[in-house]
Amino acid sequence: MARAKRGVIARARHKKILKQAKGYYGARSRVYRVAFQAVIKAGQYAYRDRRQKKRQFRQLWIARINAAARQNGMSYSRFINGLRKASIEIDRKILADIAVFDKAAFAALVEKAKGALA
């Protein structure tokens, strides 16, 4: 019978994958072959979702700004256009925060945007 010269290396690789798969359900955390596939797939999802997270947060901010702008009688696109014309440079993340936590300040921004459009 031939010698197994990479037993230590193989075990180390298997241990590494099984450690990464810790917490997965059933065979995905116990059987190397299944765990390997699960870890690879998890990596693909993580890679994809790191990019999607940026899109999703921007989407959320725009939805919040739109809702707050409409409460003050203005659409999102007209509000953003008004801010540009008034040369107010606040990014959407901060605008969304203001819309949620400081309604008076947001109303003041809407008035400035309306003034710039008029």
From Swiss-Prot:
Protein family per UniProt: Belongs to the bacterial ribosomal protein bL20 family.
Domain of life: Bacteria
Job of this protein: Binds directly to 23S ribosomal RNA and is necessary for the in vitro assembly process of the 50S ribosomal subunit. It is not involved in the protein synthesizing functions of that subunit.
SUPFAM superfamilies given in the database record: Ribosomal protein L20 (SSF74731)
GO MF terms, alphabetically ordered: rRNA binding; structural constituent of ribosome
Upper taxonomic lineage: Bacteria, Pseudomonadati, Pseudomonadota, Gammaproteobacteria, Enterobacterales
Ranges that cross the membrane: none
Listed GO CC annotations: ribonucleoprotein complex; ribosome
Key words, A-Z: Ribonucleoprotein, Ribosomal protein, RNA-binding, rRNA-binding
Name of the protein in question: Large ribosomal subunit protein bL20
GO biological process assignments: ribosomal large subunit assembly; translation
Pfam families, alphabetized: Ribosomal_L20 (PF00453)
